[in-house]
């Protein structure tokens, strides 16, 4: 009986220590996501259109414009 009380006491102390450690860590502050206008402005800059990553997108746009112009 005395042994189980001591084990329960140590378990309670361990749980309290874990809860204290969890409560001491501050929660991360979520960053605000950029708005759609700011994101669109970033993609519409001349530097973004001149980058090599934009070549496939520009190819799709030019082919769509060519196909629409033929009709």
Curated annotation (Swiss-Prot):
One of its GO terms (biological process) is defense response to bacterium. Keywords: Amidation, Antibiotic, Antimicrobial, Cytolysis, Fungicide, Immunity, Innate immunity, Membrane, Repeat, Secreted, Signal, Target cell membrane, Target membrane, Toxin. The keyword Protein biosynthesis does not apply. The keyword Signal applies. AXPX repeats lie at residues 24-27, 32-35, 44-47, 50-53, 54-57. It is found in: Secreted; Target cell membrane. Expressed by the venom gland. Belongs to the MCD family. Protonectin subfamily. Residues 1-24 form the signal peptide. Residues 25-54 form a propeptide. One of its GO terms (molecular function) is toxin activity. One of its GO terms (cellular component) is membrane. This is Venom peptide 2-long. Disulfide bonds: none annotated. The modification Leucine amide is found at residue 68.
């Amino acid at each position: 009986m005395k042994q189980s009380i001591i084990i329960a006491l140590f378990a309670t102390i361990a749980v309290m220590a874990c809860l204290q450690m969890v409560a001491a860590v501050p929660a991360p502050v979520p960053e605000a996501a950029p708005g759609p206008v700011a994101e669109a402005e970033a993609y519409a800059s001349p530097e973004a259109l001149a980058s090599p990553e934009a070549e496939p997108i520009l190819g799709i746009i030019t082919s769509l414009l060519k196909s629409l112009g033929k009709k």
